[in-house]
């Protein structure tokens, strides 16, 4: 249970950059309208040097599958989401990492425990809540890498991940 106005949601296997909190709270502090969520770039930790939960050295992923996902993440976060952010049209703040306005999350019904795409489901409900009530809001994507995650090492694991993501999207629509 969160006690403050904003909370971070992240996956258990993620490593957060040391100055993550500073990076993601700045758009909230600089905004004149409610920032309901902030997303940041996620990268693959495969191949990086991590010591006691701290990223010591960034290296490209080892292996074709993690390299594929790293490239896909960079395209998604640095090109697509940064572009959508400029127009306040981000459809989803990643479940892997995001800062959320606690009050809006609660008002929108919170996470659906039955959803397989809880990140997109909740983001869409938050946006719907704000639009239906004619409330000004922003969802911001920052270019900074704040979160590192272990990418699927094999095609089989990647397939399971993508199947779950696909089921979640179908469940929402």
Regions found by a protein language model. Name each.
Residues 114, 125-147:
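Catalytic donor-sugar/metal-binding loop of nucleotide-sugar-dependent glycosyltransferases
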Residues 12-27:
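Acidic donor-binding/catalytic loop of UDP-sugar-dependent glycosyltransferases
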Residues 116-122:
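Acidic donor-binding loop at a coil-to-helix junction in glycosyltransferase catalytic cores
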Residues 146-159:
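Catalytic cores of eukaryotic secretory-pathway lumenal/extracellular enzymes that build
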Residues 15-16, 43-45, 121:
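A short, conserved beta-strand element in the Rossmann-like catalytic core
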Residues 23-24, 122-125, 161:
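Alpha-helical scaffold elements adjacent to nucleotide-binding pockets in ATP/GTP-utilizing enzyme cores
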Residues 1, 23-116, 130, 163-170:
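Long helical/loop segments within the catalytic core of UDP-sugar-dependent glycosyltransferases
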Residues 7:
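Short aromatic/hydrophobic "clamp" motif used to bind/position activated sugar donors
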